[in-house]
Every structure is written in structure tokens, then in C-alpha cells.
């Protein structure tokens, strides 16, 4: 893990994250103009960072947030589509991979159902290698249709990459799911606003440490008339230490080199902090000393996960028993979100 240079090597992947200023757009034409602005930025960044293999832009960086529902549906993209072709041309020209946000991607039943909040990983030939749909939309505000799975794809120089989006990252389960599928870099693109800056900085670092994984966070900056976005895009080592972090500045860039051999060596030879290995080899020292084998315990000890898989509706009722039974709350009502239990006749 290296920080401070503009290079990369056969062993290191040069990764850049961008504090992209949150745009406020209303039409398809404006979205495409903004996509061209992102494309120009990619080419310029590659000139200044010749080692850059992967560039990452935040959630909402392409479309902005369409606070008007009609505009949100009208500007929703297809994948591939006009926006992705602009990005593809830039990736080919700069010979770089990219992660790009599409908010939204048209649902298969568009316009009857809400769009998805989507990220794509694109290679340096302009091909879409991974398409991820946000599993945990930021309810009650975000109206995206939820996705249902994570992916791992081989990225530049063979680094294994997973994509997650913003509120996804508040749930340790998604980080573990990606890491246990073999991800070596988890990319978290977000359009996160104040007041949650400190919590999000902590979360990214903690999840890198807990999952022995590189983390790259690209966050929006600026004010869009509704929210103020805190930036702090960052690249974090698999030991949880920050390699580079932006401030709140618009269009700030951070860059670091992520070693393939180093993370693979740590996962193979690390002992006391090899969290992925230890989770499936629980208590092996005590088991060895007790004559009960030399690999520890593999069985899952956490009742919640077994119950959730076996009985999702029953598990939901269990959670509602100590939280609430409606998605909304009467004490802070939000238009369109039910906050009273429906009476049954």
C-alpha cells in the first residue's frame, strides 16, 4: 500500500477517488452534458496521474438527485445506454477503468415500477464488467427499487472488486458478503450529506479492518439546494488505516497504489487479525489443546442469521417487536410513508 506518488506497477493498482460536486439537473440533455464533463475529467486526471488504473466517481455524480419524481423517471437510463457510451469512450481514450453512477437505471417494468440506483464497473476497453443495484436504498427519502445481490469481478491487473452504494455501507453484512466472495477492494460510492460525516469516515475504516479488504470511497461535495455533501473521499488500506483522504473541496482527488501481493500475503499468512479465516476456524487453539481437532469450529453461532434465512417474515416480526410495526413514524411523518397500523375488519 503506497501513497504520495503518481505511478503504479505490475503489482500495484493505481486507484483515484473523486469529490465530485453534486450536480442539480432536470433533463436528459443536462445529464448527458454532465456525463461529458466527467469524461473530460477522466482524460485530464490520467495526464496528471499516469499510473491511474481505476477512477471512481460518487453516487449521483452523473444524474444528480432528481427531487421531482417525473424528472427522475424521464431521465432514468438504460444500461448500456447513452451515458455509458460517453464513459466508454473516455475509458478507451485514457486507457483506464472506471466506476460510474446511474441514478437511476430503468426497471424492467419501467415506468410502472421505480428505477434502480446502479453502479457500473467499466474496463479500459469500454466494456461493462459489473453492474450493481443498490440493495439498501436510503429510506424513507430514496425511492429506488431495491437490488438483491452483490458481485465480485476481476478488475485492473486482476484485483478482485465489489461495488456497494452509500447506505449499503451502514450494514456490516454487505461488506462481509463481498469479502467472503473474494473481494480485495470494496468500492463504496456515496452521495452522503451532513450530519453523518464522522460516522461514515469511521464505518469505512472499520469495515476495511474487519474484512481485511481495501476500501475506496467516492463521495459528493457541495450543496444542491437541499443537502450539503461532506466529501472526504478516501482510500483505505486493508489494515484500516487511511492512505489518502480528501477534505470537503469540490472536485478534490485522492490517489494511492494498492498492492495485490500484499493483501494476498496478509490473507494467507496473517494470524491474530486474519478475520476472514478466523471466522470459520473459531477457537482453534483451544480445540487443539482439548484434542478436538486442529481446525476450530466452522458452524455459524449467530442465531439471527439462521433465523433470517429460514424465516424472513418471522424475523421481521421479531425486529418489529422491539422497534416499530409501521415503516413511518407518527411523531415525524413523511408524506407518502404509512405511519399507522392498518386496521383489519
Swiss-Prot record:
MF GO annotations: amidase activity
Q: Which PROSITE patterns match?
A: CN_HYDROLASE
The protein's annotated catalytic reaction(s) are:
a monocarboxylic acid amide + H2O = a monocarboxylate + NH4(+)
Q: Which domain of life is it from?
A: Bacteria
Record flagged with keyword Hydrolase: yes
Determine if Transmembrane helix is one of this entry's keywords. no
Protein name, UniProt field: Aliphatic amidase
Amino acid at each position: 500500500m503506497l501513497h504520495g506518488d503518481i505511478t503504479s506497477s505490475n503489482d500495484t493498482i493505481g486507484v483515484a477517488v473523486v469529490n465530485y460536486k453534486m450536480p442539480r439537473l432536470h433533463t436528459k440533455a443536462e445529464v448527458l452534458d454532465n456525463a461529458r464533463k466527467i469524461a473530460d475529467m477522466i482524460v485530464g486526471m490520467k495526464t496528471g496521474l499516469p499510473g491511474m488504473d481505476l477512477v471512481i466517481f460518487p453516487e449521483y455524480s452523473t444524474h444528480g438527485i432528481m427531487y421531482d419524481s417525473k424528472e427522475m423517471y424521464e431521465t432514468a437510463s438504460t444500461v448500456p445506454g447513452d451515458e455509458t457510451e460517453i464513459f466508454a469512450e473516455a475509458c478507451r481514450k485514457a486507457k483506464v477503468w472506471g466506476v460510474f453512477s446511474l441514478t437511476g437505471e430503468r426497471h424492467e417494468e419501467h415506468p410502472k415500477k421505480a428505477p434502480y440506483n446502479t453502479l457500473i464497473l467499466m474496463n479500459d476497453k469500454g466494456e461493462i464488467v459489473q453492474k450493481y443495484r443498490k440493495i439498501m436504498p436510503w429510506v424513507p427519502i430514496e425511492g429506488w427499487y431495491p437490488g438483491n445481490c452483490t458481485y465480485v469481478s476481476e478488475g485492473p491487473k486482476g484485483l478482485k472488486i465489489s461495488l456497494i452504494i452509500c447506505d449499503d455501507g451502514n450494514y456490516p453484512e454487505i461488506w462481509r458478503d463481498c469479502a467472503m466472495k473474494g473481494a480485495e477492494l470494496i468500492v463504496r460510492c456515496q452521495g452522503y450529506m451532513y450530519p453523518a460525516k464522522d460516522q461514515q469516515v469511521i464505518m469505512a475504516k472499520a469495515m476495511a479492518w474487519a474484512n481485511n479488504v481495501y476500501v475506496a470511497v467516492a463521495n459528493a461535495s457541495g450543496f444542491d439546494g437541499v443537502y450539503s455533501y461532506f466529501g472526504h473521499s478516501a482510500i483505505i488500506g486493508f489494515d484500516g488505516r487511511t492512505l489518502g483522504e480528501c477534505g470537503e473541496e469540490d472536485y478534490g482527488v485522492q490517489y494511492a497504489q494498492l498492492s495485490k501481493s500484499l493483501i494476498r500475503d496478509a490473507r494467507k499468512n496473517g494470524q491474530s487479525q486474519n478475520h476472514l479465516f478466523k471466522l470459520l476456524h473459531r477457537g482453534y487453539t483451544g480445540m487443539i489443546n482439548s484434542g478436538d481437532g486442529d481446525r476450530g469450529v466452522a458452524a455459524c453461532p449467530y442465531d439471527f442469521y439462521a433465523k433470517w434465512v429460514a424465516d424472513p417474515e418471522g424475523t421481521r416480526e421479531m425486529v418489529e417487536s422491539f422497534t416499530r410495526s409501521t415503516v413511518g413514524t407518527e411523531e415525524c411523518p413523511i408524506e407518502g410513508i404509512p405511519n399507522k397500523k392498518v386496521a383489519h375488519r
